[in-house]
């Protein structure tokens, strides 16, 4: 199971090498100017992040259901259980933040539930490497999404920025674990990865708005 690095809560996430130093990861952009943010923008951030973590839990859960109990699949089932656990922690935190800020989840949540379950089960049925390719694609979009938010929040809400930095570190650990376990050897890897990434980006846009 991937072990994510701990982020020192006293460290500015913009300068933490564990967050910005991974080879191939686009650097976190400079903070956007201005202090504070509108309630509407904060609601967008919490709503879309809650949706993303909800979908991640469903993907890993569906993949785990395919592999559990199958001969020779104990290792990947255990890995998926661990990663699902990380995502559940993230999801629980965003559920609390939605409640605290009186923000409703995205109206598209039932759609994401179905889509994530199909994606998770479908890639797992294609084999371990396809399941890892799914993880790599999803986490590459999510870690950059978090990077953009960290930049936006660094001066406006540093406490939330630090939480997102820890979550991002865990998403990156999932990504790297997938690559190390053969994600790029999956059948039709480039096509599979491109389609999943496009779907994730579309879901982000929708979840911010509704």
Where are these regions (language model features)?
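Non-heme di-metal
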Residues: 1-210
């Amino acid at each position: 199971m991937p072990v994510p690095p701990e982020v020192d809560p006293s460290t500015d996430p913009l300068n933490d090498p564990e967050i910005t130093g991974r080879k191939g990861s686009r650097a976190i952009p400079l903070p956007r100017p201005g202090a504070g943010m509108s309630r509407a923008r904060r609601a967008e951030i919490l709503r879309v992040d809650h949706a993303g973590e909800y979908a991640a839990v469903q993907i890993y859960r569906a993949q785990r259901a395919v592999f559990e109990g199958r001969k020779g699949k104990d290792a990947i089932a255990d890995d998926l259980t661990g990663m699902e656990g990380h995502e559940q922690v993230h999801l629980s935190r965003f559920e609390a933040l939605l409640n605290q800020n009186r923000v409703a989840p995205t109206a598209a949540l039932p759609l994401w539930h179905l889509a994530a379950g199909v994606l998770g089960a479908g890639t797992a049925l294609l084999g371990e490497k396809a399941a890892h390719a799914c993880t790599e694609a999803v986490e590459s979009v999510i870690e950059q999404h978090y990077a953009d938010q960290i930049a936006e929040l660094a001066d406006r809400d540093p406490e939330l920025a630090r939480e997102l930095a820890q979550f991002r570190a865990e998403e990156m650990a999932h990504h790297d674990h997938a690559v190390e376990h053969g994600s790029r050897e999956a059948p039709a890897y480039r096509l599979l990865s491109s389609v999943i990434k496009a779907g994730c980006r579309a879901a982000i846009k929708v979840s911010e708005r509704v």
